[in-house]
């Protein structure tokens, strides 16, 4: 983990966008690949997704500890679907950042 003074809100937003993208992709992959895997094998993917959600929870906890005055809208940094209408400005910003992150994978 980087020092507290270097953990800017923008660092959290970027990490949140990346985590939301990862969870979205893994959720879709789990559904799609479950058609060719046994239930036991699919359960392994589901457990990994659960682990990632726990990591998001810890990251969110750190964010609110570092920035205690953030509004409740900032729960959207680490949580929420990427393929729906944004719920608020923070959600919209994170969705756009996730799109940029995805595009960077193809550069």
Could you say what each language-model-derived stretch is?
Residues 24-38, 54-68:
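Charged/polar positions within long, soluble alpha-helices
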Residues 13-27, 43-57, 80-84:
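Generic structural signal for well-ordered, non-transmembrane alpha-helical segments
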């Amino acid at each position: 983990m980087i020092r507290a003074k270097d953990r800017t809100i923008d660092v959290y937003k970027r990490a949140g966008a990346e985590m939301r993208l990862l969870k979205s992709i893994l959720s879709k992959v789990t559904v799609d690949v479950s058609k060719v895997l046994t239930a036991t094998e699919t359960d392994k993917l589901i457990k990994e997704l659960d682990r990632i959600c726990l990591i998001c929870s810890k990251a969110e906890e750190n964010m609110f500890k570092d920035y205690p005055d953030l509004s409740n809208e900032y729960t959207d940094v680490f949580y929420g679907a990427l393929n729906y209408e944004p719920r608020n400005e923070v959600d919209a910003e994170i969705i756009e950042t996730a799109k940029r992150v995805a595009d960077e994978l193809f550069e």
